From Swiss-Prot:
EC number: 6.1.1.11
UniProt-listed GO biological process terms: selenocysteine biosynthetic process; seryl-tRNA aminoacylation
Pathway: Aminoacyl-tRNA biosynthesis; selenocysteinyl-tRNA(Sec) biosynthesis; L-seryl-tRNA(Sec) from L-serine and tRNA(Sec): step 1/1
Quaternary structure note: Homodimer. The tRNA molecule binds across the dimer.
Originating species: Anaeromyxobacter sp. (strain K)
Entry protein name: Serine--tRNA ligase
CDD domains in the cross-refs: SerRS_core (cd00770)
Catalytic activity from the UniProt record: tRNA(Ser) + L-serine + ATP = L-seryl-tRNA(Ser) + AMP + diphosphate + H(+); tRNA(Sec) + L-serine + ATP = L-seryl-tRNA(Sec) + AMP + diphosphate + H(+)
Family per record: Belongs to the class-II aminoacyl-tRNA synthetase family. Type-1 seryl-tRNA synthetase subfamily.
Binding-site residues, ATP: R264, A265, E266, E351, I352, S353, S354
Xref: Pfam families: Seryl_tRNA_N, tRNA-synt_2b
Taxonomy of the source species: Bacteria, Pseudomonadati, Myxococcota, Myxococcia, Myxococcales
Length: 435
């Protein structure tokens, strides 16, 4: 959430910065301006009324010594003035509540280092690791490979849960567990503390990281009141862990990694990635989260990006890093890098991680702070990134590591987690006859 005082003091600057995101961001900010002006008026009026109240109190004390007959009339005037103060305070409270509601749907202004642009076509490739492998055959997409190997099952999953769900069988299920363990081991060796968070959280928790109120249609929630929400990413519970806390500067940065299932309604994604496991209602991910000093968040962002890239480098998967333009960034982010892994069966680079610096945008909502050099509490900066998406790593392994005979070579770092298994070959599983 934006700082109301800062917005009110220089509205045009925020309007100009948000315009880089697109007209929608400017429109979201527009109603704030007249209400901020009304807030200033009410604050001036309240200050004036309280000054008059203090003067009236002093006058009553003086009259009590010099003119007792006039005291009752002065007290009546003071009571009337008190009623006016209460009315002004109530009006101010209403205005501030509405301002908070409005600011909850205004996105984070992009950092100055973010390139201009409207959408994914304006993103900037900043570096590439590895090369596209030359195949002596036409590489297949992962959905064809998974079906031929018998390890990815959609028909039975649809029977259980509908579209955008997948059952992993045999070697694919083992591969998923191996990837998770490998990712966690790499990240903890690089200074992250492992967290296993709750998968159901409150509305306040969802609001803290920016999913609510703007993106409720993308979430799954329970029907009880108040509802609980299934997390769309471990960023939500892990970032909120330190809500209303103050750190000593010496404790920063705080670094966490967390494995969790993620649940997303994928509203607005009809017709996109309907085949395979690229876009699911339920998937697994290892998330990286940091709380940083304000002056160190840019450097910590680059470190987090490198940590996410490291797991892909060790697996030998070809990928590139893309700096998102202002119009393509997520709601809470001030700057985001996407890591895109090469999928030869699809002939495209596909996102496998987003690594974002939210600066103090989330911290203002959850009130997480640290003591600065002067000892005064200062808002922390929050950072998050996929380290990385597990299902999409399976996609990359299936497509990049496929052989002409239809088998898939398992990257060497994962083999110890899979009992030494070196490749995935076709498997046959029991299946009944449909009645």
């Amino acid at each position: 959430m934006l700082d109301l005082k800062a917005v009110a003091a220089d509205f045009e600057s925020f309007e100009r910065r948000l315009a880089r995101r697109g007209e929608g961001a400017v429109q979201a900010l527009a109603p704030v301006k007249p209400l901020a002006a009304r807030r200033r008026e009410l604050n001036v009026l309240l200050e004036k009324q309280k000054k008059e109240q203090a003067e009236a109190n002093a006058n009553i004390r003086q009259l009590a010594r010099t003119d007792k007959d006039a005291v009752e009339g002065a007290r009546a005037s003071l009571r009337a003035l008190g009623d006016e103060v209460k009315k002004t305070e109530a009006a101010l409270g209403d205005v501030e509540a509405e301002l908070t509601r409005l600011l909850m749907v205004v996105p984070n202004p992009p950092s100055d280092s973010v390139p201009d642009g409207k959408d994914e076509h304006d993103n900037v490739v900043v570096r590439t690791w590895g090369e596209q492998k030359a195949y002596g055959f036409t590489p297949k997409p992962h959905w064809e490979l998974g079906e031929a190997l018998g390890v990815l099952e959609w028909q039975q999953a649809a029977k259980l849960s509908g579209s955008r769900f997948t059952i992993l069988k045999g070697a694919a299920a083992r591969l998923e567990r191996a990837i998770v363990s490998f990712f966690i081991d790499v990240h903890t060796s690089r200074g992250y503390t492992e967290i296993l968070p709750p998968y159901l959280v409150t509305g306040e928790t969802m609001t803290g990281t920016g999913q609510l109120p703007k993106f409720e249609e993308d979430l799954f929630k329970t029907t009880n009141e108040p509802p609980m929400y299934l997390i769309p990413t471990a960023e939500v519970p892990v970032t909120n862990m330190h809500r209303d806390e103050i750190f000593e500067a010496s404790a920063m940065p705080v670094s966490y990694c967390a494995f969790s299932p993620c649940f997303r309604a994928e509203a607005g994604s009809a017709g996109r990635d309907t085949r395979g496991i690229m876009r699911q209602h339920q998937f697994h991910k290892v998330e990286l989260v940091k709380l940083s000093k304000a002056e160190e968040s840019e450097a910590e962002h680059e470190k987090m990006l490198d940590d996410a890239c490291e797991v892909l480098r060790r697996l030998g998967l070809h990928f590139r890093v893309v700096l998102l333009c202002a119009g393509d960034m997520g709601f809470s982010s001030a700057k985001t890098y996407d890591i895109e892994v090469w999928c030869p069966g699809q002939g495209a680079y596909r996102e496998i991680s987003s690594v974002s610096n939210c600066e103090d945008f989330q911290a203002r909502r959850i009130r997480v702070r640290y003591r600065g050099e002067n000892g005064k509490p200062r808002l922390a900066h929050t950072l998050n990134g996929s380290g990385v998406a597990v299902g999409r790593t399976i996609v990359a392994i299936l497509e990049q590591c496929q052989e002409a005979d239809g088998t898939v070579v398992i990257p060497e770092p994962l083999r110890p987690y899979m009992g030494g298994l070196e490749r995935i070959a076709a498997e046959t599983f029991p299946r009944g006859v449909e009645r």
